[in-house]
Amino acid sequence: MTTRTLRFYALVGFLVFLDQVTKYLAHAYLARDFIVIPNLFRLTLAKNSGAAFSFGTGFSWLFFLLGIIALIFIGWFLPRTTGSIVFLALLQGGIAGNVFDRLFKPPYFGNGEVVDFLNTPLLSGVVFNIADLFILAGVFGTFLFLKGSK
């Protein structure tokens, strides 16, 4: 395994750890909404069986399967790319964090619900988590990187 690959998986591991710690803290301490910035940002505990930003609620098993496929694809793609691994690590870490929830959170094994807790009225009541932000940053960054390399 190359140093680059080790760095990639170390970053992915750190991102998954960060995601799981924030979800644990939200689940343990958010009994009710906590307003961080009035009318702009609050912490709201929610369970989500859909994808990022509550899209596709009720299809947890499908997003679990798509997550596994994406993790395998990124793992396959990593050695074939010469670009920055940061965006791929953000993508991999975010997907892995949410796949972990679907696997190990009730009702378990592919049907689990993802813990969401970040809420802003700017997104019309959508509640999301750190992993969703990692995924969004990874997709956006990868797109910009690929566009810039052409």
UniProtKB/Swiss-Prot annotation:
Which HAMAP family does the UniProt record give? LspA
Which residue ranges run through the membrane? 8-28, 58-78, 81-101, 126-146
Q: What class of enzyme is it?
A: hydrolase
Catalytic reaction list: Release of signal peptides from bacterial membrane prolipoproteins. Hydrolyzes -Xaa-Yaa-Zaa-|-(S,diacylglyceryl)Cys-, in which Xaa is hydrophobic (preferably Leu), and Yaa (Ala or Ser) and Zaa (Gly or Ala) have small, neutral side chains
Tell me which EC number(s) this protein carries.
Answer: 3.4.23.36
What is this protein called in UniProt?
Lipoprotein signal peptidase
Q: Does the keyword Coiled coil apply?
A: no
What topology does the record note for this protein and the membrane?
Multi-pass membrane protein
Q: Which domain of life is it from?
A: Bacteria
Determine if Nuclease is one of this entry's keywords: no
Pathway where this protein functions: Protein modification; lipoprotein biosynthesis (signal peptide cleavage)
Q: Where is the active site?
A: D116, D132
Q: Which GO terms describe its cellular component?
A: plasma membrane
One example of the protein's molecular function in GO is: aspartic-type endopeptidase activity
Instruction: Kindly list the organism's lineage.
Output: Bacteria, Bacillati, Actinomycetota, Actinomycetes, Micrococcales
Q: What family classification does the UniProt entry report for this protein?
A: Belongs to the peptidase A8 family.
Cysteines paired by S-S bonds: none
Alphabetically, which GO biological process terms does the record hold?
Answer: proteolysis
What does the function comment of this entry state? This protein specifically catalyzes the removal of signal peptides from prolipoproteins.
From the Swiss-Prot or TrEMBL record, state where the protein is found. Cell membrane
UniProt keyword annotations, A-Z: Aspartyl protease, Cell membrane, Hydrolase, Membrane, Protease, Transmembrane, Transmembrane helix
Which organism is the protein's source? Tropheryma whipplei (strain Twist) (Whipple's bacillus)
